[in-house]
Amino acid sequence: DGLYIMKNVDVYITGSNAYLLSGELATLLTGRYIEIKMYPLSFKEYLNYYKKDADEKMYLNYINRSSFPYALKLEEESEIDDYLDALYNTIIVKDIGLRKKIADTTMLRTVARFMFNNIGNCLSIKKIADTLTSDGRSISVHTVESYLESLVESYVFNKVSRFDIKGKQYLQSGEKYYATDVTMRYALLGRRNIDVGHI
């Protein structure tokens, strides 16, 4: 209450944990806050940090070393991989698991792996469920939808809907998902040859 009665005071709340992402905090602060979404560094910001011009080497560094600001301080690939593993465990396993009350996060991990392996492809929720089920991992369309919503809400992926120019409306299926930071895929898929055309 002390801050409430003081004039000229700004309070900043930062974070990305399950409580902040759940919307409960936003409900408590309704009408009294401005949300500023912070993303990992864009390629331009990455170049500005290193004071370099865009070239193939810098782009490959960007997609291999991570665009999270903390990763810029890390020297060794193993340190970056440890950091990405920690991010994965914090964001996907703990935050999403807690927020959605997922006791067994194995299937969430499977969906995340599928998404990181299909960055930029046109996907439907049914196609994802069918593909995972055909691989011996039975999962419902509803569960896939819930997990995808959680991954998007947690800023792991950005969803891009298809737009019908003639009909001037968004199509209901065939969305594309792009990773907010493509290096997070290394925590799930390991460091193997990546198709840079899809990221």
Where are these regions (language model features)?
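Conserved beta-strand termini and adjacent loop/short-helix elements that scaffold enzyme active sites
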Residues: 14, 38, 160-162
